[in-house]
Each structure stands twice: as C-alpha cells, then as structure tokens.
Curated annotation (Swiss-Prot):
Role summary: This protein is one of the two subunits of integration host factor, a specific DNA-binding protein that functions in genetic recombination as well as in transcriptional and translational control.
Xref: NCBIfam families: himA, PRK00285.1
InterPro entries xref list: Hist_DNA-bd, Histone-like_DNA-bd_CS, IHF-like_DNA-bd_dom_sf, IHF_alpha
Family per record: Belongs to the bacterial histone-like protein family.
Name of the protein described by the UniProt record: Integration host factor subunit alpha
Species the sequence originates in: Delftia acidovorans (strain DSM 14801 / SPH-1)
Subunit structure: Heterodimer of an alpha and a beta chain.
Amino acid sequence: MELTVESLDSPALTKAQLADLLFDEIGLNKRESKEMVDAFFELISQSLVTGEDVKLSGFGNFQIRTKAPRPGRNPRTGEAIPIEARRVVTFHASSKLKEQIQEGTTGSAS
C-alpha cells in the first residue's frame, strides 16, 4: 500500500510520515528523506531563533513576536503574579492555503 496523506492513521502528519512520503513520491532513500526533513525544520528553527521571519510562498509565514509583560493571576490561590515578557512564534497561513482548505483541495496535480 502506498503511503499518502489521506491514508495516515493519525490526524497529524509527523516528521517520520513526511520522510516516508518523500521516499515514496520523490524516490530518495529513507535516510536521505529523513535527513532532508530534519534539515528543513532545523533551518526554520534556526531562522526563528535568530529573529528572522520564515516565508514559505503559497503556504504561510512564521514570525517571532514579543509579548509584553502583563499581570496574571494564580487560578488556585487568586494571588496576583507578574507574567514576564517573552517571544512567541506565530503562523499566518497564506491566502492560497486558506483557499485550498476552504475548497478541500491541494496544490498538487494528483
């Protein structure tokens, strides 16, 4: 049985499954497929850590945003506690991806 996104057992696509899909679709060997997937995500991670935005045309943008400090509250005790400033990753889907999701289609010609 050929592995396709539609045949996945779980609702989430894992890195291992992505590597298997590359193996099936492109013909890389399994080691090369895994290394390519790992390298792709490592490049995205490194870029975000250094503060660079990651723009994937037709897919979306990953950005680092700084959240300001704010007052918080311990839900158990009601005690006021400060929440420190922090950096968070945000993802904004491209118009093309949003359109594909609404239509239930993919960008591939299969």
